[in-house]
Design a protein with these regions (language model features):
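M14 metallocarboxypeptidase catalytic domain recognition
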Residues: 1-311
Length: 311
């Protein structure tokens, strides 16, 4: 089993792929999978693990990170959650109950091309690496404005300008990364049922619930979603005193149409869906220092255990 020294620093993309293999080598009830392929041909590689009932027998939990390339802490967080779930199975009663109740599908990198670009060219690159449309020199689509749901319903929630950081692309799911993710979420929903969906981002310390596309529309389960996230926030704060704000995405952060958690909830039919903005609140922003990786992961693990106990 790999040890926690992995979380002392950030790593190149290939090392992350190797780390997923190391985790599956250490745990029999696991496998790697590919949800889709990026524009430049890189796999969206994930890890799937399960408990005593066997593969694919329980409802699915789907978590993913690095939709936005510069948000390096999100991949480390997803990998830490995978590590703790695998390390605790058969040893920790609560963790064992989680894996015996659900199949977990964790994808650290939705946007591998963008992530590689942040390591080679521009640390603060956000979008994927889509080539510029006609009459433009600006690369990239914001993948969290490209999900095929409420794609262009709110002009404040995305942009049709390819030079904008929130450029939504030429059409819903025009980007292979999003077509792959949407198809994978739907596949899980149809084959197993989708219990919980989380899209991990940074920064801001926010636990966001549907919806992003409208500040006036709320899901029927709005109160339940807010209650779950409030309990999660308390779990997070119990470790290092880090405070997270809870609320519907649009009114708490800003409008986002074509967003992941709205799609997961409305289209895939996830029972619970959230977009979580990790540390910090702006001191370091997207460039969270390596010494904060482990404290961030520790507190998120505590909150996640609360969440999984309540869904």
């Amino acid at each position: 089993m790999p040890d926690l020294s992995w979380f002392d620093s950030y790593h190149p993309f290939q090392d992350h792929l190797d780390y997923l293999d190391d985790l599956t080598d250490a745990f029999n009830n696991s496998e790697t999978f590919v949800s889709g392929t990026s524009l430049e041909g890189r796999d969206q590689k994930g890890i799937h693990f399960w408990g005593k009932h066997g593969k694919g027998k329980n409802k699915a939990i789907l978590w993913h990170g690095t939709t936005h390339a510069r948000e390096w802490i999100s991949a480390m967080t997803v990998e830490y959650l995978a590590y703790q779930l695998i390390a605790g199975y058969g040893k920790d009663k609560l963790v064992t109950s989680f894996l015996d109740s659900y199949d977990f599908y964790l994808i650290p990198f939705v946007n591998p091309d963008g992530f590689v670009y942040t390591q080679t060219n521009d640390r603060l690159w956000r979008k994927n690496r889509q080539t510029p449309p006609a009459n433009s020199t600006c690369y990239g689509v914001d993948l969290n404005r490209n999900w095929p749901h409420e794609w262009d319903t709110n002009p404040q929630g995305s942009s049709n300008d390819s030079c904008s950081q929130t450029y939504r692309g030429v059409s819903p799911a025009s980007e292979p990364e999003m077509a792959g993710m949407a198809g994978f979420a739907d596949k899980l929903a149809k084959s197993q049922g989708l219990k919980l969906f989380i899209d991990w981002h940074s920064y801001g310390q926010l636990l966001l619930t549907p919806y992003g596309f409208s500040c006036d529309t709320f899901p029927e389960s709005n109160a339940e979603h807010l209650g779950l996230m409030a309990a999660t926030a308390a779990g997070i704060a119990s470790v290092h005193g880090t405070n997270y704000t809870v609320g519907p995405g649009c009114e708490t952060l800003y409008p986002t149409n074509g967003a992941s958690y709205d799609y997961a909830y409305d289209v895939s039919g996830a029972e619970w869906a959230s977009l979580i903005e990790l540390r910090d609140e702006g001191e370091f922003g997207f460039v969270l220092p390596p010494e904060q990786i482990l404290p961030n992961c520790e507190e998120i693990w505590a909150g996640t255990k609360v969440m999984l106990s309540l869904v």
